[in-house]
Amino acid sequence: MLGRPKFVLASGSPRRLALLNQAGIEPDALRPADIDETPTRGELPRSCANRLARAKAEAALKSVQLDDDLRGAFVLAADTVVAVGRRILPKAELVDEASQCLRLLSGRNHRVYTAICLVTPKESFRQRLIETKVRFKRLNEDDIEAYVGSGEWRGKAGGYAVQGIAGTFVVKIVGSYTNIVGLPLYETISLLGGEGFPIRAGWLNAS
């Protein structure tokens, strides 16, 4: 990785890491931010995603500033919010939460918002918010019970993982697929490239 700036991913998400790897980018370090991700009272989905992505970036930056090997690195944070109308769905941890999410999503449209926040080596903050519309098929109780039993929903915004079994529930997607997974690749790479990060440096070894 010599010859390019250091890059830190402010996330412990295997999905976000895999998406970056898909684009030929291997972070020099992972700095997951331990923050309260509870929406504030009356907070709208867009505002929530933007606020949490910024908070994660700020927390990771503090860690990077204390590390001589990483000081001056690019820092990337992201937060994904699933919403039905103005209602923000939880990042389900309990069976009842997951079941409730799936019943709410059944047979209707919902929106997935991912906010990305990039801190440049000069410690400027750059943010973008990406929205994808998703429609689920009508789920019956057998679908819900079996999916909840799979456990793949745990910790996922909206109680599902589109890259897993829940992909079979999706009737239609309008917008970025990788946004639903947790990191909109096109917008992320465009943002990095626009701030001077050598986005093609890892392509030669990508295979």
From Swiss-Prot:
Keywords: Cytoplasm, Hydrolase, Nucleotide metabolism. InterPro entries: ITPase-like_fam, Maf-like. Its cofactor is a divalent metal cation. The keyword Hydrolase applies. GO terms for molecular function: dTTP diphosphatase activity; UTP diphosphatase activity. GO terms for biological process: nucleotide metabolic process. Gene3D superfamilies: 3.90.950.10. Pfam families: Maf. It is found in: Cytoplasm. It catalyses: dTTP + H2O = dTMP + diphosphate + H(+); UTP + H2O = UMP + diphosphate + H(+). The active site is at residue 79. Nucleoside triphosphate pyrophosphatase that hydrolyzes dTTP and UTP. May have a dual role in cell division arrest and in preventing the incorporation of modified nucleotides into cellular nucleic acids. Belongs to the Maf family. YhdE subfamily. NCBIfam families: maf, PRK01441.1. This is dTTP/UTP pyrophosphatase. It comes from Rhodopseudomonas palustris (strain BisB18).
